[in-house]
């Protein structure tokens, strides 16, 4: 929002913020304290020479004081934002020092907030989350004069930070608020819609996720070889898979793989193969699952996603009842992820699925795994889908053993989870 302060009020606030006395300013401009008081109250005139001395004395030579300077500053601010948005950090960093003089003006809350929020995006893109979080924590003190653009950037940044912390519901709330604050300068883009779609997926709401991911594809020209296009396609296909739309998911997964290979992005290609393996396992096409899994293992050999590909290999071996090799793969996986608290439950789960006839394993799956994965904020999100799969597995197991009472108990839990996924909403805490 535009500051309505007079010139005198502005220099008074600057003086007070810098801890300068009226007498000191009077000496600098070769006048009296009374004149300075009148100047600050708008009762005295100043010329260009005096203005230049005041600027130099306060260290605000390059700070925008007047309307034309402020408009020029805003224009450069949005150029800076565009550089950051386009990942052109070299030019963004070059502009940053030229825009920082706004921080010398204690009354320019909105422009300072805008500067901080664009700077926060730079911190995040550089991986400096501590600095970004510190900036966000100071932002609320500037909200009294915040413009729609500033609020958009604040909520976008806060949503991203909380997404990285896996605080999904609050993250979603901020991203949705960022959409509510779109303007001509800051509009929603495919990245925001991807994040919203991803969080809905993590929270076990695949169809809400599909709505935003499809919107990202139709509303924006992403470019057929862009990383963002590949990310959106992979997320979209994953949602279709968990929604039971296997044919749609398979087409998109294969397209994602082709796109990734076209730009020699083995990690993206491998990620597509990991999820395609899951799809083939769900369809019962074990041969295709093995082929996709082997491709994923080759592509992801030096990446953290390799653990997921290895887990899929164990699932494939369970389906072919090759329990001896499956045991070796599980042992390898446990050793690989022993220091990663987010991945260790994956191989613990598989080890119990591989020994389903053991009462200790069924007890683990019922009383530990299902409650654990039903929590939407575990295992990188999306755990609720895993909980539903475990219910289906246990129900089939108990029916095979003719333990109908247990089968019915598990079926009830499975139906409740199904209702959560396909008919429940997201409840935000105040």
Language-model-detected regions and their locations in the chain:
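Short alpha-helical DNA-recognition segment
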Residues: 19-37
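Alpha-solenoid helical repeat architecture
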Residues: 70, 107-113, 146-153, 185-195, ...
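Amphipathic alpha-helical segments of tetratricopeptide repeats
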Residues: 96-104, 136-144, 176-183, 214-225, ...
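TPR-repeat structural position
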Residues: 89, 129, 168, 206-207, ...
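Tandem amphipathic alpha-helical repeat scaffolds
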Residues: 75-86, 113-126, 152-167, 190-204, ...
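A short, Lys/Arg-rich alpha-helix, primarily the initiator
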Residues: 1-17
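DNA major-groove recognition helix of helix-turn-helix/homeodomain DNA-binding modules
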Residues: 49-64
């Amino acid at each position: 929002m535009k500051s309505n302060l007079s010139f005198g009020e502005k220099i008074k606030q600057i003086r007070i913020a810098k801890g300068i006395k009226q007498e000191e300013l009077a000496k600098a401009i070769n006048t009296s304290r009374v004149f300075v008081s009148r100047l600050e109250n708008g009762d005295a005139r100043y010329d260009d020479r005096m203005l230049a001395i005041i600027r130099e004395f306060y260290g605000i030579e390059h700070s925008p004081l007047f309307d034309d300077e402020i408009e020029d500053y805003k224009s450069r601010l949005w150029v800076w934002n565009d550089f950051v948005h386009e990942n052109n950090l070299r030019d963004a960093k070059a502009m940053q020092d030229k825009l920082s003089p706004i921080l010398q003006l204690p009354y320019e809350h909105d422009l300072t907030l805008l500067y901080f929020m664009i700077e926060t995006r730079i911190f995040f893109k550089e991986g400096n989350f501590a600095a970004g979080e510190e900036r966000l924590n100071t932002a609320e003190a500037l909200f009294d004069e915040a413009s729609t653009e500033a609020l958009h950037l604040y909520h976008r940044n806060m949503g991203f930070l909380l997404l990285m912390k896996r605080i999904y519901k609050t993250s979603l709330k901020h991203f949705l608020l960022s959409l509510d604050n779109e303007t001509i300068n800051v509009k929603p883009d495919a990245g925001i819609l991807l994040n919203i779609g991803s969080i809905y997926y993590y929270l076990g709401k695949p169809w809400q996720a599909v709505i935003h991911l499809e919107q990202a594809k139709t509303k924006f020209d992403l470019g057929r070889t862009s990383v963002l296009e590949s990310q959106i396609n992979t997320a979209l296909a994953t949602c279709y898979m968990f929604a039971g739309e296997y044919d749609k998911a398979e087409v998109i997964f294969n397209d994602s793989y082709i796109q990734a290979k076209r730009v020699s992005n083995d990690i993206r290609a491998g990620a597509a193969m990991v999820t395609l393996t899951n799809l083939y396992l769900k369809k019962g096409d074990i041969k295709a699952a093995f082929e996709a899994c082997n491709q994923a293992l080759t592509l992801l050999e030096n990446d953290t996603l390799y653990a997921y590909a290895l887990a899929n290999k164990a699932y494939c071996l369970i389906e072919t009842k090759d329990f001896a090799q499956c045991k070796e793969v599980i042992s390898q996986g446990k050793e690989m992820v022993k220091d990663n608290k987010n991945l260790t439950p994956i191989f613990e789960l598989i080890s119990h699925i591989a020994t389903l006839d053991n009462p200790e394993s069924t007890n683990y799956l019922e009383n530990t795994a299902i409650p654990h994965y039903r929590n939407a904020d575990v295992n990188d999100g999306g755990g609720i889908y895993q909980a539903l799969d475990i219910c289906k597995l246990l129900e089939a197991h108990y029916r095979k053993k003719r333990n109908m009472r247990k089968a019915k108990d598990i079926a009830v839990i499975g139906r409740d989870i199904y209702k959560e996924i396909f008919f429940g909403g997201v409840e935000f805490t105040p």
